[in-house]
């Protein structure tokens, strides 16, 4: 009887149960399944079945397929101990030096055990096209698995090859182990690479009954056909009688049964190390496996994380240059060894890794972390590779050492004996014991190493970060984003308020200037506990600021305002907590039996809210009285409207509080009254925040600055300096400042017209609607807004610089050429040079250009200072406007020269540089808008700084061109 060898999957034919398959865009016929081997008779001799397993050969008796089928080529059949050969047209994938790569164009779901499943976009290695004579079916490898795929669903990537020879794959996942001729025990023949790896199987996986077919059990005389090694200490021979189960390939993975013959044929000791595919793919890529965590491996974060600080150029002469070292030091706040890793820093992470002083610098750490957390009793040397715990648990203890063969190329770096436990993978011995994973003790989560150096076995046993040595209030242990002063609730209890005691300076973290207001707190608490009406409140002894008295200093006022706002938020939060706890488990509102509410606690909490809101109102009233003396006439009306809203809220609180006070828990007090009081109190913190924000935004106008205002004559003389020139200048625009402009000296028409005209030209921060935008722009130009930024105040030098820039930028350009006298008499130029009129024009505007360049340089310096000190948008936007207006004067000079000069050369060059300056100004406007909208984005601010630096260089070129033209 003859036997037909079907290598891979033969052509689909209608014989012996094979069927034609028609399936969409694929090839017309589906290849014959490898599962025909289930029909093999057990009594057939095994000596004629030597077909390499790399191509998933299956053996089928010719009688089973029908007598009409032709026999295979003689060379495809191996007899006796003849060397295995492939059928004609089949070439082993491992014999190729390079394999072409292909990309999946469509999804593919495997419909037979020998077919690969893949998704659209997957990249796979094409081992052989039209494999085994199957037209349109390719033998491919994907994720360590081999199988056939429809070629019309792949696209060959031209010029792209697999960097290394085809990785030995598991072959067709459902192929049963191939019998081998009997050999003496201990003798191992080379095995094709594809048969040396089988997918690892989780213990939980159990094949379904319909997915399992059995391979006939060999008799005792046929045991040698399986080529199982003998009593080699590294391998276990399968028993004489055993049953191997195999499952169909699923769309994702194919898993064999967890039997003792988990691997089809264990590799022999003489097999090449590079052909052993028992290492996870990530372990063979070299020394870059676990150098640093992925979040730290990308040195520059590739744009996902901007630099921590903006690099500002330094001024050198009249230009600006970047310092190379400055950018390297300030751009990233990372340890130096992470910026320049060397060969000795292969696994160079911060000291929290627990590195010991005597450890090697060149150790690689090729083991995934889960390998060091193996089962109990395992020898650590066998944990070099990532063994899934589920597979290990399913194996007998005697097989632990025979599962994986360690390639010499990897194991040569592994120290022997106890050195592995101490130094190889930086894992303390304590980690060898199974422990539940604690994220807080993970080496990459720890923020800093413990202060003391613990023993080696306690590397990760970090003591608690905050031992309770002191009685710290819980509020101090839970810092939140909104806790400005972090008030412990247990220290703001209402009984202290009722007693009239003064809150100590430890409750609010107020700087020393605000501590002078402590007696005021006592008066506030004692006066507010009476629950009096509005008339009595105005006559109380609260002394925040009394109208008619000198306003508070700016710093003290800002600090007091923040303290008052925080007091309102804290007292309301306490009231809401008190009422909320009543509805909780065990509360007096949660039980069916009526209980008496804690009236005294509720009254004290309501009184505290009244007092906090009342004190904020008194502070706001004093600010309203100060608003009548500011340069902005609309400020008083706006602040009055904000104050009136807060007054209405306070009156509502007083009414509900009086109901609670008069009821005293009797018939006059109901739970509905309490609910209405709580509902009214919920909106109080937001109203107080709006009022405080408005006061803070105009604090520089409402309160006295730290720098005492100059004497009267100085202020008045600076105001009346060339008023006609200011009014007629093209650069005239309001820069209101409290010491200068008053209601008598600034006509309404001039202020409004010039402000609107400036808005038309430089409105580039569109954050609100038109009206809101114009109001914001006007505030940006006020010196008070600049003063109140930067955490309370700017330095005195910056304030003087801002005032000087106001005057310089507002100074108009001189157009009167008739009254101009050159510093040196005009010398006639060379023949064919400029005419006298053009030379005079160039010299005149060259002087104007140099004067304005000084102003521009000062404005750029101030702008860079604001950016370098991380000032908020309202500061650097105002400084950028000084830069823009100063540079715009140079554009005006160039435009005038291009229109009045007679020489074509002068007109062309001046026009070119004027257009260049205009383009740079547009770029500065756009980048400044982006930096303001994206604040505090360092990348956006850096782009803005770069544009201003380019503007400085271009203005210097413009001046040099004017000088060259004038000297021609």
Curated annotation (Swiss-Prot):
Residues 844-894 are annotated as: Divergent helix-loop-helix motif. GO terms for molecular function: protein domain specific binding; protein kinase binding; SH3 domain binding. Residues 233-249, 715-753 have a biased composition (Polar residues). Residues 164-277, 393-416, 503-544, 705-756 are annotated as: Disordered. The keyword Acetylation applies. The modification Phosphoserine is found at residues 237, 390, 526, 535, 737. Residues 167-182 have a biased composition (Pro residues). This is Breast cancer anti-estrogen resistance protein 1. The gene is Bcar1.
């Amino acid at each position: 009887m003859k036997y037909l060898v079907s290598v891979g999957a033969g052509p689909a034919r209608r014989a012996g149960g094979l069927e034609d398959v028609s399936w969409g865009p694929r090839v017309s016929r589906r290849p014959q399944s490898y599962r025909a081997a289930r029909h093999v008779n057990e009594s057939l001799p095994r000596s004629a079945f030597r077909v390499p397993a790399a191509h998933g050969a299956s053996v089928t008796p010719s009688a089973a397929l029908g007598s009409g089928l032709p026999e295979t080529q003689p060379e495809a059949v191996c007899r006796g101990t003849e060397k295995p050969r492939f059928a004609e047209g089949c070439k082993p994938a491992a014999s190729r030096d390079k394999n072409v790569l292909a990309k999946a164009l469509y999804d593919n779901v495997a419909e037979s055990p020998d077919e690969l499943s893949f998704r659209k976009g997957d990249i796979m290695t094409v081992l052989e096209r039209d494999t085994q004579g199957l037209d349109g079916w390719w033998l491919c490898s994907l994720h360590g698995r081999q199988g056939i795929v429809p070629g019309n669903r792949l696209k060959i990537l031209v010029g792209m090859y697999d960097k290394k020879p085809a990785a030995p794959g598991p072959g067709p996942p459902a192929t049963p182990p191939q019998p081998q001729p009997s050999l003496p025990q201990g003798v191992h023949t080379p095995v094709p690479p594809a048969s040396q790896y089988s997918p690892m199987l989780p213990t939980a996986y159990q094949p379904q009954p319909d997915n399992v077919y059995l391979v006939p059990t060999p008799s005792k005389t046929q045991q040698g056909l399986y080529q199982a090694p003998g009593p080699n200490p590294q391998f276990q021979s399968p028993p004489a009688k055993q049953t191997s189960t195999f499952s169909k390939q699923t769309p994702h993975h194919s898993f064999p049964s967890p039997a003792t013959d988990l691997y089809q044929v264990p590799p022999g000791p003489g097999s090449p190390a590079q052909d052993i595919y028992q290492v996870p793919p990530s372990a063979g890529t070299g020394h870059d496996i676990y150098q640093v965590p992925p979040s730290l491996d990308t040195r520059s974060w590739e744009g996902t994380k901007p630099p921590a600080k903006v690099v500002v150029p330094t001024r050198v002469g009249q230009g600006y240059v970047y310092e190379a070292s400055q950018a390297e030091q300030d751009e990233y706040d990372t340890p130096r060894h992470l910026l320049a890793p060397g060969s000795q820093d292969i696994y160079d992470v911060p000291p929290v890794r627990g590195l010991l002083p005597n450890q090697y610098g060149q150790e690689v750490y090729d083991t995934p972390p889960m390998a060091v957390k193996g089962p109990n009793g395992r020898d650590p040397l066998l944990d070099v590779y990532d063994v899934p715990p589920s597979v290990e648990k399913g194996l007998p203890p005697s097989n632990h050492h025979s599962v994986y063969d360690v390639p010499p190329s990897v194991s040569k770096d592994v120290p022997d004996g106890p050195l592995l436990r101490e130094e190889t993978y930086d894992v303390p011995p304590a980690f060898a014991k199974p422990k539940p994973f604690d994220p807080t003790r993970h080496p990459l989560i720890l923020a800093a190493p413990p202060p003391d150096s613990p023993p080696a076995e306690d590397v990760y046993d970090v003591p608690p970060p905050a031992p309770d040595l002191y009685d710290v209030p819980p509020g101090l242990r839970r810092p939140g984003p909104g806790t400005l002063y972090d008030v412990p609730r247990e220290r703001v209890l209402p009984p202290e308020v009722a007693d009239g005691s003064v809150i100590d300076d430890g409750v609010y973290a107020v700087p020393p200037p605000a501590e002078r207001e402590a007696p005021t707190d006592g008066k506030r608490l004692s006066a507010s506990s009476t629950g009096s009406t509005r008339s009595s409140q105005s006559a109380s002894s609260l002394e925040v600021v009394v109208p008619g008295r000198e306003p508070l200093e700016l710093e003290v006022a800002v600090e007091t305002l923040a303290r008052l706002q925080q007091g309102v938020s804290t007292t309301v939060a306490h009231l809401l907590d008190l009422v909320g706890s009543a509805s909780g488990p065990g509360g007096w509102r949660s039980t069916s039996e009526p209980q008496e509410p804690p009236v005294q606690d509720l009254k004290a909490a309501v009184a505290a809210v009244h007092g906090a809101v009342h004190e904020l109102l008194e502070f706001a009233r004093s600010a309203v009285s100060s608003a009548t003396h500011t340069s902005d006439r609309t400020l008083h009306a706006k602040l009055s409207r904000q104050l009136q809203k807060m007054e209405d809220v306070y009156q509502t609180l007083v009414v509900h509080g009086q109901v609670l006070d008069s009821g005293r828990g009797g018939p006059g007090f109901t739970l509905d009254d309490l609910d209405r009081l709580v509902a009214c109190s919920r909106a109080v913190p937001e109203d107080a925040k709006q009022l405080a924000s408005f006061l803070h935004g105009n604090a520089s106008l409402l309160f006295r600055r730290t720098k005492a205002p100059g004497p009267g004559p100085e202020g008045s003389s600076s105001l009346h300096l060339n008023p006609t020139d200011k009014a007629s200048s093209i650069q005239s625009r309001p820069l209101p400042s409290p010491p200068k402009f008053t209601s008598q000296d600034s006509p309404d028409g001039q202020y409004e017209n010039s402000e609107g005209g400036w808005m038309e030209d430089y409105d580039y921060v569109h954050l609100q609607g038109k009206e809101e935008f114009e109001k914001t722009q006007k505030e940006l130009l006020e010196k008070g807004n600049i003063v109140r930024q930067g955490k309370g105040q700017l330095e005195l030098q910056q304030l003087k610089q801002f005032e000087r820039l106001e005057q310089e930028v507002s100074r108009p350009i001189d157009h009167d050429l008739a009254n101009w006298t050159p510093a040196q008499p005009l010398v006639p130029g060379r023949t064919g040079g400029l005419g006298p009129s053009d030379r005079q024009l160039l010299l005149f505007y060259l002087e104007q250009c140099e004067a304005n360049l000084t102003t521009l340089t000062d404005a750029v310096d101030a702008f860079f200072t604001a950016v370098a000190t991380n000032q908020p948008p309202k500061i650097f936007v105002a400084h950028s406007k000084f830069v823009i207006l100063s540079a715009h004067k140079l554009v005006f000079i160039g435009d005038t020269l291009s229109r009045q000069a007679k020489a074509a050369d002068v007109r062309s060059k001046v026009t070119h540089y004027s257009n260049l300056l205009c383009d740079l100004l547009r770029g500065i406007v756009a980048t400044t808008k982006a930096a303001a909208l994206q604040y505090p984005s360092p990348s956006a601010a850096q782009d803005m700084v770069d544009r201003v630096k380019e503007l400085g260089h271009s203005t210097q070129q413009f001046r040099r061109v004017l000088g060259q033209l004038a000297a021609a």
